[in-house]
Amino acid sequence: MENFPTEYFLNTSVRLLEYIRYRDSNYTREERIENLHYAYNKAAHHFAQPRQQQLLKVDPKRLQASLQTIVGMVVYSWAKVSKECMADLSIHYTYTLVLDDSSDDPYPAMLNYFGDLQAGREQAHPWWALVNEHFPNVLRHFGPFCSLNLIRSTMDFFEGCWIEQYNFGGFPGSDDYPQFLRRMNGLGHCVGASLWPKDLFDERKHFLEITSAVAQMENWMVWVNDLMSFYKEFDDERDQISLVKNFVTCHEITLDEALEKLTQETLHSSKQMVAVFSNKDPQVMDTIECFMHGYVTWHLCDARYRLHEIYEKVKDQDTEDAKKFCKFFEQAANVGAVAPSEWAYPPVAQLANVRAKGDVKEAQKPFLSSIELVE
């Protein structure tokens, strides 16, 4: 395995953060913790239900880590929506992360997918059965156009995860393949459409802005994720089908060239995002800016992306990019570094055990020791 290109990564990250003029002022610390705990608590009770425990069959520690990661993403990025909407989106996106981390072959359970869908029967695939049951809780927050985007994008995501089961990065010369797969599994339209709940936006009045935001968010959101997750995915056997590495294979270019290609496209997308919406409805622009800055904070602060390792590695270096990266990292940590023990309680496993014993009230008591396992 080749060495991680630390200096190159620092340079690309700094260029992105400077380009979007990163500054996260979405919450006070108290507001952030309050929203985190509200969304987490509702989602944790959802996944502690016997049906979810039986059908998902996810290792408790991994489910706990996935839930904490997604609650952070939603609360930090969807800063303008209601706490109830945050909680329902947290559940939905936790399901997607569980699927993304799965290695199960979906083929047998998908043989009669459309027949079951048409007849109104429960899906044979347990993930679809659970997601479909929860979907009404998500869609109640949105108008029909945004809802259609959420449904369609979730279906695309499932197909993208199916493709990734084959660990196929594309054939050399297949230039369209990397972006095809990334759009499929990126949830860009789902994310773009879920920024506009009907209690805040009339989708008929803002139809053009919403449509444009979905189009722009499809690329910006997934490309930023690819840049910020490049470090964690670099030497992980499960993450070798990344956009950057697929660029290397299909475009037959070097890793540095692939990373630069992604960087340039991300910067261009950021420029478009600001230029397109800067003179539109102020509420629309505010929502987009809050998402962009919160989304970056989440990546810098969440343990899943391990960017604290980069920070520790370069904090004593005297290069310009190292100093700028560390300044941005510290800026994000000042607002977004909140220990899970402050909000992610009780653990899902504890709730599930208490439910099995029939004492739900006992599950409301904080039980922090097991949380430390996934901090």
From Swiss-Prot:
Domain of life of the native organism: Eukaryota
Pfam families recorded: TRI5
Swiss-Prot/TrEMBL catalytic activity: (2E,6E)-farnesyl diphosphate = trichodiene + diphosphate
Keyword 4Fe-4S applies: no
Protein purpose: TS is a member of the terpene cyclase group of enzymes. It catalyzes the isomerization and cyclization of farnesyl pyro-phosphate to form trichodiene, the first cyclic intermediate in the biosynthetic pathway for trichothecenes. It serves to branch trichothecene biosynthesis from the isoprenoid pathway.
Note: Trichothecenes are sesquiterpenoid toxins that act by inhibiting protein biosynthesis.
Protein name: Trichodiene synthase
Organism: Fusarium pseudograminearum (Wheat and barley crown-rot fungus)
